[in-house]
Amino acid sequence: METKTFRATDAELHYAEGPPNGLPLVLLHGLTRDWRSFTVLLPEFVSRFHVFSLDLRGHGESGRVKDGYRVSAMAEDVKEFVQREIGSPTALFGHSLGAMVGMFAAAGNPNVSALIVGDSLLTPGNLAAMYDSIFSQLHRLLLRGGSEQDLARGIGTIEIHFPGISEAIRLEELPGNSGAVLREWARTAIRTDPECLRMTLDRSAHADWDPESILPSIACPVLLLQGNPDLDALLSDSDVALAKRLLPCAQHVRFPLLGHALFMQQAKPVLDEVLRFLAALQ
């Protein structure tokens, strides 16, 4: 894939583009991640689609914008990118924050032909259960400064609380959080503007979010990918019910063995569902 830049009205976006092998597919990563978050899916995607994997504003090598990290503002960047850089019907696949951005960008937008929502919250208050604590600790680590190695060690010591367990558990103690996984998170987190986390924590990032008005205006087919809420997934059962009520054309797949990370935890089941969904549209 070739890395490039795109100048939106309010921010410069860094992105990676694959060869024109099919339907344009824009990939939108989660908070404190970057375009490489989709690495495990890219070989299959690149062989089938014209892939554009973006760094959202404030992340990776994209530009910083003072007080400019509302999800709606990020979505405006994406809408401009699709209209000016691609210029033809485009599928969006967002994970976590990227999925919220995708929903905003798809609303009332005839240039979006399909939307994949990867374990995104619909109710920002859902962050309070676990992720507010994680993001608050990560925010403090970023403000403290230091090397990627220092940050990786710090991320490993972030404490989380699970229902029914009295003692806090450190991220490095959880299965799957190997040294390599923590180092990769540190690599992307250190390249994230800490203001993205602050605006998430104080909810100013979600100031314009109103699912009751946004979701009904998404006319394209939507695939909801839900992890298991008992395994730290953000998309709750009540949010799924809300989305299915409000979205004109929605499908839903639940992965009982996967948490919020979805494909970063296990690629194949997620890949299979995404390819099935997109194949039916072509």
Where do the language-model regions lie?
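Conserved hydrolase catalytic core segment
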Residues: 88-131
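Conserved HGGG/HGGXW glycine-rich cap/lid loop of the alpha/beta-hydrolase fold
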Residues: 16-64
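Active-site loop/oxyanion-hole signature of alpha/beta-hydrolase fold enzymes
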Residues: 53-97, 264, 272
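Catalytic histidine-centered segment of alpha/beta-hydrolase-like enzymes
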Residues: 258-267
